[in-house]
UniProtKB/Swiss-Prot annotation:
GO BP term, pick one: photosynthesis, light reaction
Protein name: NAD(P)H-quinone oxidoreductase subunit 3, chloroplastic
Organism: Vitis vinifera
Uppermost EC category: translocase
InterPro entries: NAD(P)H_OxRDtase_bac/plastid (IPR023043), NADH_UbQ/plastoQ_OxRdtase_su3 (IPR000440), NDAH_ubi_oxred_su3_sf (IPR038430)
Gene: ndhC
């Protein structure tokens, strides 16, 4: 059976780090003046009236690069703790990490074949 008292600091940190932003939003909503006029509802760019349309289209390539970056960033987040405790975990966890890396390699080859990594 797990002894959960070892995680008291984690739970306290989680609760405090969740309560502080909620309180900040609540207090700012209560204390902020409510004034909705035409100036409040108009858009601006750096304090001046906007020139042109407010909606700009961006290329889908930015989205694809961001998606591939997130995949490899998450891979790093998962593999770093494994690498730090490699000598303690054993062979079974090594095999699981290899399977994880192989799945990510298959995904990156798929993205490469589909042209997600090309900037043309």
């Amino acid at each position: 059976m797990f002894l959960l008292y070892e995680y008291d600091i984690f739970w306290a940190f989680l609760i405090i780090s969740s309560v502080i932003p909620i309180l900040a939003f609540f207090i700012s909503g209560v204390l902020a003046p409510i004034s909705k006029g035409p100036e409040k509802l108009s858009s601006y760019e750096s304090g001046i009236e906007p020139m042109g349309d407010a909606w700009l289209q961006f290329r889908i390539r930015y989205y694809m690069f961001a998606l591939v970056f997130v995949v490899f960033d998450v891979e790093t987040v998962f593999l770093y703790p494994w690498a730090m405790s490699f000598d303690v975990l054993g062979v079974s966890v090594f095999i699981e990490a290899l399977i994880f890396v192989l799945i990510l390699i298959v995904g990156s080859v798929y993205a490469w074949r589909k042209g997600a990594l090309e900037w043309s």
